UniProtKB/Swiss-Prot annotation:
One of its GO terms (biological process) is rRNA processing. Keywords: Cytoplasm, Endonuclease, Hydrolase, Metal-binding, Nuclease, Ribosome biogenesis, rRNA processing, Zinc. One of its GO terms (molecular function) is zinc ion binding. The lineage of its organism: Bacteria, Pseudomonadati, Chlorobiota, Chlorobiia, Chlorobiales. GO terms for cellular component: cytoplasm. Binds 1 zinc ion. This is Endoribonuclease YbeY.
Length: 144
């Protein structure tokens, strides 16, 4: 299967919705899937990856690695469900919607969007809102 989802936590996820979301974001942006691994993990694991590969000693919501430069995406992303839960409380949003937002954010990173500048961050936020509205309202589902 070109997109594999792994959940290393005890939290239940609506994996089919998350998979459809990633594939649809890529397709809508003109990209396909060669091979993508999506790992939903805890705070400890994402902090270790952040420290080992990016030299940042803290937990974050998502880390994305892209291994191809063509329109067929080969890559992986890690999402910390613990950080998602913390952010959902902090921003007073539903955990499921925050999880969907960060999954969309990760898909956007895979295709080359960057949030390291003000303009890039704004562009990503607009794309996130577009896709978040598309999936949360059109499907009337959340990824739980």
């Amino acid at each position: 299967m070109p997109l594999q989802i792994f959940n290393t936590t005890r939290k239940e996820l609506h994996e089919e919705l998350l998979e459809r979301t990633v594939i649809d974001v890529l397709d809508s942006e003109g990209f396909g899937v060669e091979s993508i691994v999506a790992v939903y993990c805890g705070k400890k694991m994402i902090r270790k990856i952040n420290r080992e590969f990016l030299q940042h000693d803290y937990a974050t919501d998502t880390i994305t690695f892209r291994y191809s430069d063509n329109r067929e995406i080969d890559g992986e992303f890690y999402i910390s469900l613990d950080v998602i839960e913390e952010n959902a409380r902090r921003f007073e949003v539903d955990f499921k919607l925050e999880l969907l937002r960060v999954t969309i954010h990760s898909a956007l990173h895979l295709i080359g969007y960057d949030d390291q500048t003000v303009d890039g961050r704004l562009q990503m936020q607009q794309k996130e809102e577009f896709y978040l509205n598309r999936y949360s309202e059109a499907n009337n589902q959340t990824p739980s």
